[in-house]
């Protein structure tokens, strides 16, 4: 990495995701879905029809505000990762059968909200990682990909090409914004999508973004696709490619062997297994973000696709012991994730799940109340 690039991007990102805002997730904002059969943003817009517009615009205006950016800056957070859907720029996206009789069901106007987020970020000194979270046809079958139980993004050239077009539009629109730090080409493509297809897409995405965003100004980020980082050894490396970041997501609540751990096992996984993994990833030459992590230890209120039973490792603890456990688990993860170039808690705000709500974790004392360099390691009481 050249000296100019190294200087700008040596700053460690300590961030949060602004999930559930411009891409809906039912578990994060259940009040929006009350009385509906909808499970994701697609079915939400299809079911509500014209009524979706006032509901979503109210949500966009109130769920995240300038006050939230101010609070994050005060707390020492220096970056936000903002998930966006392929429908962000309006109604020219390809049709999917899930839309039914509506050729373009999604509510328009999200791009103006994103414009406002850039203004707030600049005002309060936060950096932004833009994240294509929901691609046409859905890339993972999760609700956060736009269509639950559908994974067809990789099966049609129209879907793939439109995702690339959205990345190019994002780069063109925001390349002059001081807050733009990185663009992520696709969130969590499913584990069974061919690695070579993902590499081809990511390489093309890199070139599309670089048409407007120079390497000295903006990083290009790609997710590991739920496979070993070793499958990307030597991928998109210098000198032909520059300022490329690998994104990994680390949770201990989606696999039964993790869910069955007691709190000591969760802590050990964080400070031993994940620490050793971090050393290996760094040794392999990858600049890396942990783009998502949380304090979640079970899926009872979170997952629409996982089946129970949902073991709660803290169920037998009293409130004081639970607080200790969450603080220890948070510290264990942070000790490891600080080895990377940056991390982003999932998510900043939820309605009902404090373990997944950064602001609530801070308020409850599970996470530090100041993440600025000068505050770390000091008594902030």
What does each model-found stretch correspond to?
Residues 1-17:
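N-terminal module-boundary/linker segments of secreted carbohydrate-active enzymes
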Residues 11-15, 23, 27-219, 224, ...:
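Active-site mouth of glycoside hydrolases
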Residues 19, 24, 346:
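Structured beta-strand/turn binding interfaces of compact recognition modules in eukaryotic regulators
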Residues 139-147, 190, 196, 202, ...:
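Short, electropositive alpha-helical surface patch
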Residues 165, 172, 179, 186-331:
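Extracellular glycoside hydrolase catalytic/binding regions
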Residues 315, 319-381:
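Aromatic-rich peripheral "rim/lid" segments of glycoside hydrolase catalytic domains that contact
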């Amino acid at each position: 990495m050249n000296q100019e690039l190294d200087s700008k991007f040596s700053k460690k990102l300590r961030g949060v995701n602004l999930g559930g805002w411009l891409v809906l997730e039912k578990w994060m904002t259940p009040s929006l879905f009350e009385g509906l059969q909808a499970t994701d943003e697609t079915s939400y817009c299809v079911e509500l029809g014209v009524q979706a517009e006032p509901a979503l615009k109210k949500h966009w205006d109130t769920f995240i505000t300038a006050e939230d950016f101010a609070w994050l800056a005060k707390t020492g957070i220096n970056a936000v990762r903002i998930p966006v859907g392929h429908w962000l720029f309006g109604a020219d996206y390809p049709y999917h059968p899930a839309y039914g009789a509506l050729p373009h069901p999604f509510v328009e106007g999200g791009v103006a909200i994103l414009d406002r987020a850039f203004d707030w970020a600049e005002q309060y000194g936060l950096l932004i990682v833009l994240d294509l979270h929901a691609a046409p046809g859905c890339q993972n079958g999760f609700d956060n990909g736009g269509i639950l139980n559908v994974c067809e993004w990789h099966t049609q050239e129209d879907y793939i090409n439109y995702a690339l077009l959205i990345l190019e539009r994002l780069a063109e629109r925001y390349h002059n914004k001081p807050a733009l730090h990185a663009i992520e080409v696709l969130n969590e493509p499913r584990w069974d999508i061919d690695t070579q297809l993902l590499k081809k897409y990511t390489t093309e995405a890199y070139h599309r973004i670089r048409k407007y965003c120079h390497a000295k100004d903006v990083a290009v980020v790609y997710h590991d696709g739920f496979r070993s980082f070793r499958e990307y050894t030597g991928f998109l490396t210098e000198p032909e490619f520059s300022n490329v970041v690998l994104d990994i997501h680390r949770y201990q609540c989606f696999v039964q062997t993790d869910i069955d751990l007691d709190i000591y096992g969760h802590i050990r996984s964080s400070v031993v297994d994940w620490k050793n993994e971090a050393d290996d990833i760094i040794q392999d030459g990858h600049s890396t973000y942990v783009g998502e992590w949380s304090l979640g230890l079970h899926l009872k209120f979170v997952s629409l696709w996982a089946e129970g039973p949902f073991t709660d490792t803290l169920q037998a603890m009293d409130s004081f012991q639970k607080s200790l456990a969450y603080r220890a688990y948070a510290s264990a993860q942070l000790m490891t994730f600080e080895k990377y170039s940056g991390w982003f808690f999932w998510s900043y705000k939820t309605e009902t799940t404090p373990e997944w709500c950064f602001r609530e974790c801070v308020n409850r004392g599970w996470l530090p109340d100041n993440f600025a360099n000068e505050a770390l390691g000091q008594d902030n009481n």
